[in-house]
Curated annotation (Swiss-Prot):
This is Coiled-coil domain-containing protein 50. It comes from Homo sapiens. Isoform 1 and isoform 2 are coexpressed in placenta, liver, lung, kidney and pancreas. Only isoform 1 is detected in skeletal muscle, brain and heart. Residues 63-130 form a coiled coil. Found in a critical region of hereditary spastic paraplegia (HSP) SPG14 locus. No causative CCDC50 mutations were found in HSP families. Keywords: Acetylation, Coiled coil, Cytoplasm, Deafness, Non-syndromic deafness, Phosphoprotein. Pfam families: CCDC50_N. Phosphorylated on tyrosine residues. The gene is CCDC50.
Amino acid sequence: MAEVSIDQSKLPGVKEVCRDFAVLEDHTLAHSLQEQEIEHHLASNVQRNRLVQHDLQVAKQLQEEDLKAQAQLQKRYKDLEQQDCEIAQEIQEKLAIEAERRRIQEKKDEDIARLLQEKELQEEKKRKKHFPEFPATRAYADSYYYEDGGMKPRVMKEAVSTPSRMAHRDQEWYDAEIARKLQEEELLATQVDMRAAQVAQDEEIARLLMAEEKKAYKKAKEREKSSLDKRKQDPEWKPKTAKAANSKSKESDEPHHSKNERPARPPPPIMTDGEDADYTHFTNQQSSTRHFSKSESSHKGFHYKH
C-alpha cells in the first residue's frame, strides 16, 4: 500500500489549530444555548397559553354560575311576589266577606231593634188604653222618640244589647250546668277509684296474711317434725308413744262426732323456750295486724258511706 505524502510546509501551527478548535467549540456552545433558550421560550409560551385557556374556562364557568344564581334569585323573587299577591288577595276577599257579614249582621240588628221598637210601641199603646198616664210621664216618654216614630241612638243600643244579654245569661247558665255535671261525674269517678283501691288493698292484705299463715304453719310442721325426730332419739320416748297409742285406741272406741260438729283442732307441737317465745311473738304480731287491718277497713268503709 502506498503511503500518502503530507506536505509539512503547508500544515498550520499548533496555536492556530487550538484557536480554531476554541472558535468551533464556542460556536457549538452558543448554538446549543440558543436552542435551549428557544425551547424554554416555546415551553413558557405553551404553559402561558394553557394557563390563559384554563383561566378563561374558569371565568366562563363562574360567569355561567353567577348568571344561574341571578336567574334563580329573580325567579324566587317573582315567586315570593306572586305568593304575596295571592295572600293579599285572599286577605282582601276575607275582609270583603267580613265586611259583608258585618253589614248583614248590622241589618239584622236594625231589624231586631225596629221590631222591638214596634213591639214596645204596641205595648205602650196597650198600657195607655188600660191605664191613663200623667202629663209628666207622657212628656218624659215622648222625649225618647222622634216625631216620625224612630228611636234615639241610646235606646236603639239598649234594644240591640237586650238579646245579647239574654244570650250571655243563657250561656252562663249552660256553662254552670255543664260544670256541675262534670263535677258530679268526677266525684263519682273518684269514689269508684277509691273503692277499687280499697278492695285491692284488702285483697293484698288478705293475701299477705294467708302467706304468713302458710309460712307459720310450715314452720310449725317443721318444728313438730324436728321435735319428733329428737324424741325418737331419746330412749324414754317409746313408753310415751305406747301410752299415746293406747289413748288413741281408746278414743277410736268412742262414738264418732256428728258431721255438723266441728272437728277438734290438733294440739300444738311442743317447743323449747326460745321457740315458744318466737311463736308467741309472731302470733301476737299477726293478731295485731289482723285487728289493725279490720279496723282500718271498717273505718274506710264508714268514710265511703259518708
